[in-house]
Amino acid sequence: MMIRQRLTVVAAATALGLAVAGLAGGTAQAATAKPKPPAKSGAAASCSRARLPLPDPTCTPGAYNPAVTQATIGSTICVSGWTATVRPPASYTNALKTQQIAQYGFSDTNPADYEEDHLVPLELGGAPRDPHNLWPEPRYGSQPAQSKDQVENKLKTAVCGGRVSLAAARGAIASDWTTALSRLGL
């Protein structure tokens, strides 16, 4: 009995320590943490598909990582490999993707047909785990998910090269990634 109590106390202390470490790290969370979708009333199809290939701005308005500012881009987004340090694990994004496919009311419910994409990309300091910055972007259609990746890379290059401010790039991609480059003259 005494050993069981001691193991319970040690396990609880370890779990508490991990939770505190995850909070202290800012972007780390337990891999088993269940994602919380944006608060919406109603059931399935609470998000509109009318703006595809863009997300519903009510469900997915975008969100920023507070560690990334114009002053910190030299030590964050402009450092090669930095996004890998903040990218959420697939266990988190896959669970969120399944929830959001239902919220968007997609008739195709196969998660493989969607990329759980950051509206404001990690390359521009988008919030890594905020459900308001993530959405199930279709991998099919006239402008599939991989089309946006090229825009993200060009915007990051322009921001890191000093041709566009971080705020301008974030605003352009969040409002309409299909016109972001032309709006910024890139």
Predicted regions and their residues:
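Short active-site segment of divalent metal-dependent hydrolases/proteases
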Residues: 121
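Nuclease and nuclease-like effector domains acting on nucleic acids or nucleotide cofactors
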Residues: 2-115, 124-186
